[in-house]
Amino acid sequence: MNDVAIVKEGWLHKRGEYIKTWRPRYFLLKNDGTFIGYKERPQDVEQRESPLNNFSVAQCQLMKTERPRPNTFIIRCLQWTTVIERTFHVETPEEREEWTTAIQTVADGLKRQEEETMDFRSGSPSDNSGAEEMEVALAKPKHRVTMNEFEYLKLLGKGTFGKVILVKEKATGRYYAMKILKKEVIVAKDEVAHTLTENRVLQNSRHPFLTALKYSFQTHDRLCFVMEYANGGELFFHLSRERVFSEDRARFYGAEIVSALDYLHSEKNVVYRDLKLENLMLDKDGHIKITDFGLCKEGIKDGATMKTFCGTPEYLAPEVLEDNDYGRAVDWWGLGVVMYEMMCGRLPFYNQDHEKLFELILMEEIRFPRTLGPEAKSLLSGLLKKDPTQRLGGGSEDAKEIMQHRFFANIVWQDVYEKKLSPPFKPQVTSETDTRYFDEEFTAQMITITPPDQDDSMECVDSERRPHFPQFSYSASGTA
């Protein structure tokens, strides 16, 4: 779509994701799916270039509700493999109808456009430009992946939206982590709408420190992501046992994380957003693997809708708490928090009371143990700046600014990417099914996958429900 135009604009009340107050925002909806909000109505081009909120309504799901306020509507979609929601309200039912109709019209137009692109691409499967969006049917015409093709070995994690299981592919003997999400949580049963799956980001990402996606497929009641399995355990697990890492060990892990985030930002134009120790795994050799296993730990029922407090609040950046637009700099805040934990043995800000915790994140100055070296203090101070524009990595140079910091002075970044640096710790795993570095709370549990009403194959997907997840299925070419 070459000509981007404003479809609708006006004032909306947006509810904060974390501090649940309502804030007036002036929103612009564009025909490319962009849905951007400002504190004041933008008067010129310069003001339009710095929105507080920046969302996409592409193939979103819309829900109307009268709670927690009358004339509320909710936009729900998948961001990577995590469900996100944004809540708005207006003064009258007519206003709500105007907004939801406009949003649905834009989403439908984008869906048609994508289908036309898909039709064009599917005619030339050898064209790699469209490979990330091809169905399994295109990659392997005679075969569709089903749940029956895996042995289910051990539970690796569990949450509100589903579970992560260690599986073995029967045909190849290869081990993977399968993330299984329940459709009923993602798609309201009484809504005929489309849910965006940004799993194409995972499909098309190739980086040594990012978890690769091997397959994604759906059954009539589940979405399944089959991902590379790193059995060196969570960094959280290792840090919990050792309490603190040396600066050299933290530097090694930090460099691999920076390399991966640089790739996502510069090559994929993606903000990871959810950097925390639990999402950092080690592979069998001790290298970092950033995962997307994110399962919401707790679900909070809020009125008529399921409002989920996803993620660990200790990692939230100030701009996220203030409900401002967050760009790439949010990932550098996350890097600051995890590196602080590694080198200091505790979180930079902590309080069991969430409101007090948020106040600390927004207001409290960072403190360091006396044992920390000057370069480490300088790095962490830069990464944990409250103002994202002043943060290390917050400028146009992004990751390059962090790479040039004196804490990383001895790091050769190409060597990092090529895994030429020796890991400071090598996991003592004896086999691919060795889960000693995973929480026994999960691995000791029996695996239960509730039997569906009919065979769990792609063919059984009810044609009425299948369109909820268009172009969801995927198979990586070659080996993951």
Swiss-Prot record:
One MF annotation (Gene Ontology) recorded for this entry: phosphatidylinositol-3,4-bisphosphate binding
Regulation: Three specific sites, one in the kinase domain (Thr-308) and the two other ones in the C-terminal regulatory region (Ser-473 and Tyr-474), need to be phosphorylated for its full activation.
Glycosylation-annotated residues: 126, 129, 305, 312, 473
Pfam families xref list: PH, Pkinase, Pkinase_C
GO cellular component, one term: nucleoplasm
InterPro entries in alphabetical order: AGC-kinase_C, Akt1, Kinase-like_dom_sf, PH-like_dom_sf, PH_domain, PH_PKB, Pkinase_C, Prot_kinase_dom
Modified residues (N6-acetyllysine): 14, 20
Domain PH: 5-108
Active site: 274 (proton acceptor)
Ranges where the record places region Disordered: 451-480
Stated consequence of mutating residue 473 to A: Inhibits insulin-induced activation of endogenous Akt1, insulin-stimulated protein synthesis, insulin-induced activation of glycogen synthase and insulin-induced phosphorylation of 4E-BP1 in a dominant negative manner when overexpressed
Residues the record lists as Phosphotyrosine modifications: 176, 474
Domain Protein kinase: 150-408
Effect of residue 308 to A: Inhibits insulin-induced activation of endogenous Akt1, insulin-stimulated protein synthesis, insulin-induced activation of glycogen synthase and insulin-induced phosphorylation of 4E-BP1 in a dominant negative manner when overexpressed
Its biological purpose: AKT1 is one of 3 closely related serine/threonine-protein kinases (AKT1, AKT2 and AKT3) called the AKT kinase, and which regulate many processes including metabolism, proliferation, cell survival, growth and angiogenesis. This is mediated through serine and/or threonine phosphorylation of a range of downstream substrates. Over 100 substrate candidates have been reported so far, but for most of them, no isoform specificity has been reported.
Protein's recorded name: RAC-alpha serine/threonine-protein kinase
Source organism per UniProt: Rattus norvegicus
Classification lineage: Eukaryota, Metazoa, Chordata, Craniata, Vertebrata
